[in-house]
Design a protein with these regions (language model features):
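FIC/Doc superfamily catalytic core
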Residues: 1-204
């Protein structure tokens, strides 16, 4: 069962917003587990679950890696036959650098690289933003306070987000890893979240 955006925009938008709320509830559970288990809790099964809930009833291929080509503007993600290998590398890189990189470095890498691989048919951005926040919280050792969390702030500041992705893409194209621009962008959003008065985020 699924709804096409072209068939009923209002229903599609409502389902998508409800999915984001459900994804946040799942994400908080994942963060709690991550705080107990550390780097080993970060695995493909968590990513599958976060993607599945993000696209429930708007895509029939949620929660599984793509097995077909996908195109994103000027970016051409890896061939679908290579997705599983790239995702193994992605997860290993995060686990191996868990105590080396800062929370914002881990989150910047997690956000950029998942978008670069684009492992899912739908919901890659939503899954990447949730992953980014998971890494920020777990690596920082707490479910971070603030009534407007980083993923929501990213949605509101697309220019900085896209500039960070493009800068990291270009660096990788040139033969090196440089996520500095994305890290600076996330650090500013995180600071704004932590300084935001009010109750902790409740979804929405």
């Amino acid at each position: 069962m699924f709804v096409l955006e072209q068939e009923d925009q209002e229903l599609y938008d409502r389902i998508q917003e409800q999915n984001l709320n459900r994804q946040y509830e799942l994400l908080t559970n994942c963060i709690e587990i991550g705080l107990k288990k550390g780097s080993v809790a970060f695995d493909k099964y968590m990513l599958w679950a976060l993607n599945h809930v993000a696209v429930a009833n708007i895509s029939q291929f949620g929660g599984r890696f793509r097995v077909e080509p996908i195109y994103v503007g000027d970016h051409k993600p890896p061939h679908f036959k290579d997705v599983a290998d790239w995702m193994d590398r992605y997860i290993s890189t995060i686990q191996e650098n868990w105590y080396i990189w800062s929370p914002t470095e881990l989150a910047a890498y997690g956000l950029w690289r998942l978008n670069w691989i684009h492992p899912f048919i739908e919901g890659n951005g939503r899954t990447a933003r949730a992953t980014c926040y998971y890494l920020l919280c777990v690596r920082s050792g707490a479910l971070l306070p603030g009534r407007k969390i980083v993923p929501e702030r990213i949605r509101e500041d697309r220019v900085g987000y896209e500039n960070g992705l493009k800068a990291a893409d270009q660096a990788w194209e040139d033969g090196h890893l440089d996520i500095t621009k994305m890290e600076d962008y996330l650090a500013a959003l995180l600071q704004a979240q932590l300084e935001d008065d009010g109750l902790p985020y409740q979804g929405g």
